[in-house]
A protein has these predicted regions:
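Local sequence-structure signature of Cys/Sec-based thiol-disulfide redox active-site neighborhoods
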Residues: 1-25
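PLD/PLD-like phosphodiesterase catalytic module centered on the HKD motif
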Residues: 29
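General small-molecule cofactor/ligand-binding pocket signal
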Residues: 32-34
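Short Gly/Ser/Thr- and Asp/Glu-enriched loop/turn motifs at secondary-structure junctions
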Residues: 36-40
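A short, hydrophobic beta-strand/beta-hairpin element that forms part of a small beta-sheet core
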Residues: 41-49
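Non-catalytic, surface beta->alpha helical segment in thiol-disulfide oxidoreductase systems
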Residues: 49-70
Length: 70
């Protein structure tokens, strides 16, 4: 399973926290982190957008959204 997290510089710690939580839940997950200058926090499962906003939501909510799609 491939998850990509695209985040603005101010949200880097949130992205790394989400990556850690996903790796704890799914041992086979590959997580790519991509920083951007835009104000954006987006999570993609394979090529589909799971979450996208200009602010962060909690990790459990994003993990729930991913679980709905797998």
């Amino acid at each position: 399973m491939l998850v990509t997290i695209i985040y603005s510089e101010s949200m880097e710690s949130n992205a790394k926290s989400l990556r850690a939580d996903m790796k704890a839940k799914w041992s086979d997950v590959n997580v790519n982190l991509m920083g951007t200058r835009r104000t954006l926090y987006q999570v993609q499962l394979e090529s589909k957008v799971v979450y996208s906003a200009d602010s962060v939501t909690d990790n459990n909510s994003i993990i729930d959204l991913i679980e709905e799609r797998i």
